[in-house]
Regions:
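Glycine-rich, aromatic-flanked loop segments that form ligand/cofactor-binding clefts
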Residues: 54-88, 207-223, 264-288, 325-332, ...
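Aromatic-lined carbohydrate-binding/catalytic grooves of carbohydrate-active enzymes
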Residues: 291-426, 439
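C-terminal beta-sandwich/jelly-roll accessory domains of carbohydrate-active enzymes
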Residues: 627-703
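Short Pro-Gly-centered flexible turn/kink motifs
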Residues: 248-267, 693-700
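Polysaccharide-binding surfaces and accessory modules of carbohydrate-active proteins
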Residues: 3-14, 22-228, 647-661
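Conserved, mostly hydrophobic/aromatic
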Residues: 11, 130, 253, 298, ...
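Active-site neighborhood of glycoside hydrolase catalytic domains
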Residues: 356-358, 392, 396-549, 559-564, ...
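Carbohydrate-binding surface patches
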Residues: 11, 199, 602-644
Length: 703
């Protein structure tokens, strides 16, 4: 095999050189036509030798070794007691299989073997998987294994995301400077503040235009993501698991496999990167829309909270069926002593106090009106006021014999303890065996502190256990769907996505807040995996009051549903909701398969968000006025992503009523206009003057 390996797919190339004995990524980016002079490329990438530097050029490969002259954090950090902290790996073998290449390297002195696997998918997404094996007889402690990829020197900005509970994934963009911009997650889960993806971008890159390089970690535990520019001017991105003290100690012939890093390049902006990720995920055989359409869901939490009553819930089921709901979900409060949030977690047995005849009667009622039944669990958690905790207080994560501080009046079960694991699995499995349950909402409502298994740090074991739990429950109950919820928008990542079928995007159903939460979460996660519900007129989370149209239009852009006491909805409300669910069902094939587009705008007061069919035959857009416009006449609405050479019929549709405007007359095109795709994207159409916190839908159909 040549020293140079060229992977290319879908307009992306990755070129790796092993001439120096270590794999070095020479290029990750725009596709390079095969047949180029490999030797010439290698020569162009040999560093000069400045004064006051190493006497010979040093090749810094993917392992970033100090032994090769790299002055910075190496890819692998670890040691044996008093030795083998510095490494020098040499490639011993490489295997090319289509667009996947695997390198195995050995450091004979340190008695370590490392493997790096580069897979360039059909969608042009690069998956980098690495692992280290201890070939020695003594133990080797792994401190970290972080995967790094170089990006061009002309990258200018970092785009990543911050947040908090009920305001997740808010963008922040800043200049790349010398040093390291590091984002660490230490909650034991992917937190509300987690970035999900981190981009390095050319200076002018936007949603629609320019080059972007992004890294996302396929992992649901502690993590680190970074962008680094060294003093010599080289820039790289990295991601990996954040390991706690002695969390990974390898005995002889044991292996640590780091979480896969998912790397995406696009030369057509953030939306181009997003499209590659969505396409990759949708190509999975297990992707939910490859199995069935996404059903309209009613979750009754905000309708009843802990006040469970059969007659009330039966009336909700009747109302839900009337307006076209397809799935009914009973949330918290059905089990053990769970009459409030301070007791009962851990006792996954139907409460005789609330449901003396069991849940079967309610399930039968829900099924009788044509709805699926779903049920809420929070199996990783336990209240100290529970039968489980009283019997097994040692089954919680804890270090030093201390009980960790309570968080939402609960503790975390140590699922690495097989007894605790089997307790949760068996009680959950028993409920699923007894009742016809199509779907479970699985919550995770606290951070992990002092997360130890018998005193040893065990975040990794906890994450592996929940992956196992979901997989075993689904294997035992084919067709079961699991929604991952973690106080709403936590634990949304490319690790959990292979084990769950849906994410609860945020506990915040306020439509104004959801505009940005939904928009930026969907950069990585396809909208069909993101729960987006219409809440009541007055949001329980913020107290804001919004029109039906704004709430309904906002909730359309995901796996749609409701959180509303429908028994209190008026006849007009129910008619609106029936119209909206009918429209969602008519458009969900488009919404859940098309290319997501986010038009660049000159104002931050409004935004255009859309989905374009893969064949560009149709599209649906949302124009949202978030706050009052900067101008008396807002900037034009541009409909991006259409076929530039085709003509489209463009019109406003109002399945949930009209947006409230501040204008004597609407723009002339409202009832329909035929316009070329090129003009719709470049010139656009005059925007209406909407009141703040309003949104409208625009259809485009090729004619």
């Amino acid at each position: 095999m040549s020293n140079l390996t060229h992977l290319t797919n879908a307009g992306v190339s990755v070129i790796i050189d092993t001439t120096s004995g270590t794999p070095a990524v020479l290029h990750w980016g725009r596709a390079i036509k095969p047949g180029f002079d490999a030797e010439a490329l290698v020569q162009t990438q040999i560093e000069p030798t400045p004064h006051c530097d190493f006497d010979e050029p040093q090749t810094i490969g993917i392992w970033r070794e100090n032994s090769r002259g790299f002055i910075g954090e190496p890819t692998i950090k670890g040691s044996r007691p008093g030795r083998d902290w510095s490494h020098h790996f040499t490639v011993r073998s490489s295997q090319l299989d289509g667009n996947t290449v695997t390198y195995v390297s050995i450091d004979a002195e340190a008695e370590l073997e490392v493997e790096a696997r580069f897979e360039l998918t059909e969608q042009g997404v690069l998956k980098l998987s690495q692992k280290v094996t201890n070939l020695g007889l003594s133990e080797f402690t792994v401190e970290s294994l972080t995967s790094y990829l170089p990006v061009p020197d002309y990258t200018k900005d970092i785009l990543d995301f911050h947040g908090r509970w009920m305001r997740e994934r808010q963008p922040q963009r800043q200049e790349i400077r010398v040093g390291t911009w590091l984002r660490e997650g230490r909650e034991g889960r992917t937190g509300h503040d987690a970035t999900t993806i981190q981009f390095a971008m050319a200076e002018s890159s936007t949603f629609e235009h320019g080059e972007v390089w992004g890294l996302s970690l396929a992992w649901s535990g502690n993590s680190r993501q970074l962008v680094e520019r060294t003093a010599i001017g080289r820039t790289s991105m990295g991601a990996g698991e954040l390991l706690l003290a002695d969390e990974v100690i390898l005995k002889s012939n044991e292996t640590y496999a780091a979480p896969t890093v998912v790397a995406v390049y696009a030369n057509d902006g953030i939306d181009g990167a997003s499209h590659r990720l969505h396409s990759m995920l949708r190509a999975r055989p297990t992707h939910p829309t490859n199995v069935r359409p996404r059903p309209v869901t009613l979750n009754v939490w905000e309708a009843v909270y802990f006040d469970h009553d059969y007659d009330k819930l039966a009336a909700l089921a009747d109302a839900a069926a009337e307006i076209g709901v397809e799935r009914f979900v009973l949330d918290d409060g059905w089990f053990g002593a769970r009459r409030h949030d301070r007791a009962g977690l851990g006792d996954w047995v139907v409460s005789k106090d609330v449901w003396p005849e069991g849940l079967g009667k309610l399930v039968d009622k829900v099924k009788s009106v044509g709805l699926e039944f779903g049920l809420w669990f929070e199996g990783e958690m336990v209240n100290q006021d529970s039968d489980l905790y009283r019997e097994h207080p040692d089954w919680i994560l804890q270090a030093g014999g201390r009980v960790p501080p309570e968080f939402r009046t609960q503790q975390v079960l140590d699922l690495a303890h097989e007894g605790a694991y089997q307790h949760v699995f068996n009680q959950t499995n028993a409920i699923l065996n007894e009742l016809d349950i199509a779907y479970i909402k699985w919550d995770h409502n606290r951070v992990l502190t002092e997360a130890a298994h018998y005193g040893k740090a065990a975040v990794r074991k906890q994450v592996e256990a929940i992956y196992r739990m979901f997989d075993e429950l689904k294997a035992a109950h084919p067709g079961l769907e699991i929604e991952s919820c973690s106080s709403g928008g936590g634990r949304i990542d490319l690790g959990m996505i292979d084990h769950a079928d849906r994410f609860w995007t945020s506990d915040n159903n306020d439509a104004l807040e959801r505009q940005s939460i939904n928009r930026y979460t969907s950069i990585v996660i396809p909208p069909e995996l993101l729960g987006t519900h219409i809440g009541p007129t007055k949001a329980h989370s913020t107290g804001r009051t919004h029109s039906h149209a704004f709430r309904a239009v906002t909730a359309l852009w995901g796996h749609a549903g409701l959180e509303w006491d429908l028994t209190e909805a008026s006849a007009e409300d129910r008619a609106m909701l029936k119209s909206w669910t009918d429209y969602y069902k008519a458009k969900r094939a488009l919404l859940h398969s098309g290319r997501t587009v986010r038009a660049d705008g000159s104002e931050t007061t409004n935004q255009v968000h859309g989905v374009v069919a893969q064949d560009k035959s149709e599209a649906l857009y949302m124009y949202a006025q978030l706050t009052t416009s900067d101008y008396s006449r807002p900037a034009n609405i541009r409909l991006t992503g259409l076929d530039a050479d085709a003509t489209y019929l463009v019109k406003v549709v109002e399945p949930a009523g009209a947006a409230v405007a501040m204008q004597a007359l609407p723009p002339k095109w409202y009832d329909g206009v035929r316009i070329p795709g090129a003009l719709s994207a470049s010139v656009g159409m005059r925007a209406p003057v909407l009141r703040p916190e309003q949104a409208m839908l625009i259809e485009a159909t090729r004619v």
